[in-house]
A protein has these predicted regions:
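Conserved active-site segment immediately N-terminal to the catalytic lysine
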Residues: 149-184, 213-215, 220-225
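Hydrophobic/aromatic ligand-binding patch that stacks against planar heteroaromatic rings
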Residues: 84-86, 139, 163, 180, ...
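Active-site PLP attachment segment
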Residues: 166-210, 235
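Phosphate-binding glycine-rich loop
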Residues: 23-71, 85-89, 95-97, 162
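N-terminal "arm"/small-domain region of PLP-dependent enzymes with the aminotransferase-like
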Residues: 1-23, 223-225, 357
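PLP-dependent aminotransferase class I/II
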Residues: 33-36, 44-47, 108, 120-124, ...
Length: 384
């Protein structure tokens, strides 16, 4: 099966919701219910559903109301939107290096990048693996810096049974088509424990409307407290989100079990690859499974591309991985206030990483066939 894969219950209910005519967030019950259930799952007081994960990031930043020309520290290895959201909200991205194994933002490099203008840190839980939130929170509290958690790839990930997205000041998720949770192709969520941030986000994504003064009467109501925009999610998307949320723990357990059998194989080739498997206290969401060629291998970059090419020929979905150095994108080169020095670890990961898709809709027998292909491709390329 391909992912996303939607249940028969969801597919049948799409027709029912369409037939009801209540398809807009402001008319139906599912958007509000999705927000409440998501808050319960994460362990936060408030959540706001939006049209996509990028919108969620931009609104989250806006809610912090940072001073003009503020700097926001972000890992250089991530999806483009993790950094473009900073530019689109009028602030300055400062890129930090990442750990060579976890691929998450390095606390030591955050410390080096902090200036008087640093007002926030975006922690990206890349590939579903939680960042070192304890260390980051201690530093942020000491320096009075806000934390935004980008959980776009980390649905259900946790540290000591505490869900990612419940550590920072405000957090965001994406429900794009390839994510662990998908709301029919697009969707996003913002979550926080802070009422003032919730109030801003709730109003901003609906044209700045004061939702407490939004009753339908025969009179016209002036209820726009400030300028916002329309980033609402639909009722059908919200119903899909509720369906996915019900099954998230089951999905996550299956993804974890699948990842274990792949790592069992990769561990046989430690002369060629580095990899990271988290400790018991850290639960990854396993959005992608990463391993990295060792740089002391002759022609390691050529071998990497050959492995990826061979795996793809055999219908095993494989990638080089996340954008290794976002600041190399042409869009950032045009900005006068961005003059980054290339970051050592990000550069290395850009040359060594291999990412495998984890498809939890497949049976274990199908994964065993894929494992055999992976074994054959590795041994062929290293002439074992």
């Amino acid at each position: 099966k391909n992912w996303p894969n939607f249940s028969k219950n969801l597919i049948s209910n799409v027709g029912r919701i369409l037939g009801s005519g209540k398809i807009n967030y402001t008319d139906g019950p599912y958007g509000i219910k999705f927000e409440k259930e998501f808050s319960k799952f994460v362990g936060n007081r408030y959540s706001i559903a939006v049209c996509n994960g990028t919108a969620a990031l931009e609104v989250a930043i806006k809610s912090l109301k940072l001073p003009k020309n503020s700097e926001i520290i972000v890992p250089a290895r991530s999806f483009f939107a993790s950094a473009s959201c900073i530019v689109n909200t009028g602030y300055i991205p400062v890129f930090a290096d990442v750990n060579l194994l976890t691929q998450n933002i390095l606390i030591d490099d955050i410390k080096k990048k902090i200036t008087k203008r640093t007002k926030a840190i975006i922690c990206v839980h890349l590939a579903g693996l939680p960042c070192d939130m304890d260390s980051i929170k201690k530093l942020a509290n000491k320096k009075k810096i806000k934390i935004i958690e980008d959980c776009s790839q980390a649905h259900g990930a946790s540290i000591n049974n505490k869900q990612v997205g419940s550590f920072g000041d405000i957090s965001t998720w994406s429900f794009c088509n390839d994510k662990i949770m998908s709301t029919l192709g697009e969707g996003g969520m913002i979550s926080t424990n802070k009422k003032n941030l919730y109030e801003f986000c709730k109003r901003y994504i609906n044209h700045g409307t004061n939702y407490k003064n939004n009753k339908k009467t025969e009179k016209f109501i002036y209820n726009k407290d400030y300028f916002g925009t329309n980033l609402r999610i639909t009722e059908i998307q919200s119903f899909a989100g509720l369906e996915q949320l019900k099954n998230l723990k089951k999905i996550q357990n299956k993804r974890e079990n699948i990842s274990k059998i792949y790592f069992d194989l990769i561990s046989n080739y430690q002369d060629f690859f580095n990899y990271y498997y988290p400790s018991k206290k850290i639960k990854s969401a396993w959005y992608r499974l990463y391993f990295f060629l060792k740089t002391d291998i002759k022609n390691y970059q050529k071998i990497r591309f050959k492995i990826i090419k061979d795996l793809r020929k055999n219908n095993l979905k494989c990638f080089t991985g996340s954008c290794p150095e976002i600041y190399l994108e042409k869009a950032f080169k045009k900005l006068n206030n961005i003059r980054p020095i290339r970051l050592k670890n990000c550069k290395i990961l850009g040359e060594t990483s291999i990412a495998l898709e984890i498809n939890h809709t497949l049976e274990y027998s199908q994964h065993k066939k894929k494992l055999l292909i992976l074994k054959q491709v590795i041994e062929k390329n290293f002439q074992i």
